[in-house]
Amino acid sequence: GITSNRGLCGGFNNNIIKKVNGLLAGEFSGYNTKVISVGKKANDAFKRGDKGFRPEGIGAAEDMFNDLTFDRASQLAQYLMDEFQAGKVDKVVIIYNKFINAASQDVMVEPFLPIIPTVSEGSSSTGDYIFEPSKTEIVEDMIPKSLKIQLFKGLLDSHASEHGARMTAMHKATDNASDLKRDLTLEYNKARQAAITNEILEIV
């Protein structure tokens, strides 16, 4: 689950935590499921239970956004691929906020492993091609790169969504504070006017 390190961003983090808990209680209930938390908020939510998991040897995943680089994302992606190839896990999904615009984010549950091949609709004629290097070598090289890019994209999407959610939340907070200030100023002026009127009546 990918969250942020900081709050003040509306329901950004709670939406991810709620989605993860929903999957643990639903689709993944009865399985030995582990949650790798990327971001401090997810780590705080799951470290107290038996689902939170910190991979060894790749650094603390919850600190990813302190230094978000492709290399750090690649380390985590490689760890997930190694665990899958070793048969230690059967399925990996990435849960993150997809950036739509500054005011809107969608919670995504994106399959990571195993890779599900897509089949194109309709018949398409393809000629015979000679691949150099071989098809196998190309696939073995491209798939890990593609998965690393997929994870990095999810992290970047989440990072952009965090800033958008925080900007929107702070804008609403500013508007609410302005409304409150206006209402309090009006109440103060009314009370002050009433006090002055009472003083004038007492003098008369």
Predicted feature residues:
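C-terminal beta-strand-loop-alpha-helix "lid" module of Rossmann-like NAD(P)-dependent dehydrogenases
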Residues: 1-204
